[in-house]
């Protein structure tokens, strides 16, 4: 069981590090490029694609959110891969993996492969946190005197 736990930590940490690096590989699109790209998907059957484009482009156009997300993915992925900081890395990654899963659940419901992939990442993250429940259960269940 311990080897599976280590493999899950390394897999999730590596995946987050890779995702964080990818946030910095492409240049930020100009606002006019986003508008031109969005205009291609105005048909009713392409509403999901339009929502995805506008959502991701909006995050990139803020000037900071996309970079902060990339830095957090890198940092928390590294924390997850280091033995002593694995629990805190998993805890900090929980909202990020939840967000990624919900993004794919609501904006890409037809892409089953990515939905399963992000669901597995979220489940691994939940599993890593649950495995360390002795560290946090006292915060939820207080014993009566």
Give the positions of each predicted feature.
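Individual transmembrane alpha-helix segments
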Residues: 55-72
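Generic transmembrane alpha-helix motif of multi-pass integral membrane proteins
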Residues: 74-81
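Juxtamembrane membrane-water interface segments that cap and precede transmembrane helices
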Residues: 47-57
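Short, solvent-exposed cationic patches
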Residues: 46-47, 107
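Residue-level signal for transmembrane alpha-helical positions in Major Facilitator Superfamily
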Residues: 12, 72-73
